[in-house]
Amino acid sequence: MYYPFVRKALFQLDPERAHEFTFQQLRRITGTPFEALVRQKVPAKPVNCMGLTFKNPLGLAAGLDKDGECIDALGAMGFGSIEIGTVTPRPQPGNDKPRLFRLVDAEGLINRMGFNNLGVDNLVENVKKAHYDGVLGINIGKNKDTPVEQGKDDYLICMEKIYAYAGYIAINISSPNTPGLRTLQYGEALDDLLTAIKNKQNDLQVMHHKYVPIAVKIAPDLSEEELIQVADSLVRHNIDGVIATNTTLDRSLVQGMKNCDQTGGLSGRPLQLKSTEIIRRLSQELNGRLPIIGVGGIDSVIAAREKIAAGASLVQIYSGFIFKGPPLIKEIVTHI
């Protein structure tokens, strides 16, 4: 009930400043009795996926809590899973500000953050302090100054450091804001990366005596042929899941709107149909061989149901959470 008033105040601020202010407050309460201020009781609706049991099918998408600073406070809101990151081996500032823009009328966001984060070691320390009892995903990427040809080394470094603490590991090769990153989605580059990741997963499984599933996050801007090739590679390399989708470079649904021409990835409602169509095509191609986590423009129960009807086993929210707040979590989990 209160969120529309909170949103009105936050939307008076620059988008990144609003995010920083919100996280400043969440950091103060995370892991303390004051978490009760944001706690919501949601029904248990367990889902088995990637060998894990999720308390409910709704997760928080990567990008909101990049450094894992507010895991417990976000968990108290009712998410069945939380995906933190994207994190890189070394800290990096990301792209120059301003780099986050609202498209208020479309309930969309454009970001060109550029994997700003405090590095994987810092994230691991934050995860160690958390008491969240849902599934914790950790989304990993490469540093901006790491050549794409050596990009797989960054993923392997992150895997080593997070493996003991992750419920699952998400491989981000689809952000449009790190130069060259999306080229890792194609052909030989993808095969090389997935081979290295599976070998590392096998080694770490032996070392830690536990199996941590791997999901690959893909872009919504893949052609039909590219999508078929990606699906084939994921199956051949025994990847455990696929997250569809990341943000889009397509601006066709937001032409003429304020901020529509900003460089970066578009998320929120304008991405909804495009991501659902990718999920549908991907589901047909995979034919049940690995599960899909659906993300992109989910801002209602209906939108969440559409993702599941298209073939997703689980769903995630980000922009919808910014525009609708914690009540959206309870609404989706209750009625999905």
Swiss-Prot record:
Xref: PROSITE patterns: DHODEHASE_1 (PS00911), DHODEHASE_2 (PS00912)
Cofactor note: Binds 1 FMN per subunit.
Protein keywords: Cell membrane, Flavoprotein, FMN, Membrane, Oxidoreductase, Pyrimidine biosynthesis
UniProt-listed Enzyme Commission number(s): 1.3.5.2
Involved pathway(s): Pyrimidine metabolism; UMP biosynthesis via de novo pathway; orotate from (S)-dihydroorotate (quinone route): step 1/1
One GO-annotated biological process of the protein: 'de novo' pyrimidine nucleobase biosynthetic process
Active site: residue positions: S175 (nucleophile)
Binding site for FMN: A62, G63, L64, D65, K66, T86, N139, N172, K217, T245, G268, G297, Y318, S319
GO molecular function, one term: dihydroorotate dehydrogenase (quinone) activity
Cofactors: FMN
Cytoplasm in keyword set: no
Ligand binding (substrate): K66, N111, R112, M113, G114, F115, N172, N177, N246, T247
Cysteines joined through disulfide linkages: none
Subcellular localization: Cell membrane
Coarse class of the protein's main subcellular location: membrane
Keyword Flavoprotein: yes
Catalytic reactions on record: (S)-dihydroorotate + a quinone = orotate + a quinol
Subunit structure: Monomer.
Family, similarity comment: Belongs to the dihydroorotate dehydrogenase family. Type 2 subfamily.
Function of the protein: Catalyzes the conversion of dihydroorotate to orotate with quinone as electron acceptor.
Record protein name field: Dihydroorotate dehydrogenase (quinone)
Organism: Escherichia coli O1:K1 / APEC
